UniProtKB/Swiss-Prot annotation:
It holds the Pfam family Bac_DnaA_C. Plays an essential role in the initiation and regulation of chromosomal replication. ATP-DnaA binds to the origin of replication (oriC) to initiate formation of the DNA replication initiation complex once per cell cycle. Binds the DnaA box (a 9 base pair repeat at the origin) and separates the double-stranded (ds)DNA. Forms a right-handed helical filament on oriC DNA; dsDNA binds to the exterior of the filament while single-stranded (ss)DNA is stabiized in the filament's interior. One of its GO terms (molecular function) is DNA replication origin binding. Belongs to the DnaA family. SMART domains: Bac_DnaA_C. GO terms for cellular component: cytoplasm; plasma membrane. Domain I is involved in oligomerization and binding regulators, domain II is flexibile and of varying length in different bacteria, domain III forms the AAA+ region, while domain IV binds dsDNA. One of its GO terms (biological process) is regulation of DNA replication. Gene3D superfamilies: 1.10.1750.10, 1.10.8.60, P-loop containing nucleotide triphosphate hydrolases. This is Chromosomal replication initiator protein DnaA. It is found in: Cytoplasm.
């Protein structure tokens, strides 16, 4: 899935390694940049491609973002396969991100997919509500916006499955304040958020209700509202149900009895 922070994690790895004293050579590529570097060197002839291979071989930690976009890349994949083997044989590290697991990747040599599968595969999960609230709080503080707790919960509940959307919301609020040529409220309340986002394409309009909370949570977790209302005990459904109940209590100020009736 997009917007979960895979690129941020790769850049954090590069930053952390760059700050250590072990003098490891770390290089971050987007898949398109990596392909372009290989294709450009291929077009410039044998000497240039050998020079590029030599440069890549001196890297200790190679980071490539969105590896799925290297599918059906022909010679680029062949060179990458040989580079991958070189890294394994020399105890170097490769970290890749993708929108799917190795066995779901199409357009790659089976040997390369096998190499991907041999490594540690970790799924980046959708942030839970507490993590999403912390992300909202962090992004707001960067631009000196002081959001009320209700405002943070509102943004996290409706947009917390995509960090890019959270950033977009914060940018929209900041821009609205600048556009109005007014000082930001000392504390930005939920009513202010609704005003700032009234023309925002992702923003749910109207009054917040239990049903709207269920709809948004169900969408974020890829399940139906009917599943939330059911007695099914599958882990993802239980988690979604608990998040919806939590938001109902926090945003709508419902007590336990009222939440029990709603769910």
């Amino acid at each position: 899935d997009s917007g979960l922070g895979k690129t941020h994690l790769l850049k954090a790895i590069a930053h952390e390694i760059g700050n250590t004293k072990n003098k490891l050579v770390v290089k971050y590529y987007t898949s398109s940049d990596f392909r372009k570097e290989i294709v450009d060197s291929l077009q410039d002839g044998f000497k240039e491609i050998e020079s590029t291979k030599e440069k890549l071989s001196k890297i200790d930690v190679l980071l490539i973002d969105d590896i799925q976009f290297l599918a059906n890349s022909g010679k680029t994949n062949e060179i990458f396969f040989n580079l991958f083997n070189f890294f394994i044989e020399n105890n170097k590290q490769i970290v890749l991100t993708s929108d799917k697991f190795p066995e779901q990747l199409n357009g790659f040599d089976k040997r390369l997919v096998s190499r991907f599968s041999q490594g540690l595969n970790v799924k980046v999960e959708t942030p839970d509500i507490i993590t999403a609230i912390n992300i909202v709080d962090y992004k707001a503080k960067i631009v000196n916006l002081n959001l009320s707790e209700e405002s943070k919960k509102y943004i996290a509940s409706f947009f917390g499955s995509d960090v890019r959307k959270i950033e977009g919301i914060i940018n929209k609020i900041e821009f609205s304040i600048i556009q109005d040529n007014s000082a930001a409220p000392k504390i930005i309340e939920l009513e202010d958020i609704n005003k700032f986002l009234e023309d925002y394409s992702f923003a749910p309009g109207g009054e917040i209700t239990v049903q709207k909370i269920k709809n948004v949570v169900a969408q974020n977790y890829g399940i139906s509202v009917k599943s939330i209302d059911s007695r099914l005990r599958m882990a993802n459904i239980v988690k979604a149900r608990h998040v919806a109940m939590f938001l109902t209590g926090e945003i709508l100020k419902k007590n336990y009895s009222e939440i029990g009736v709603a769910f």
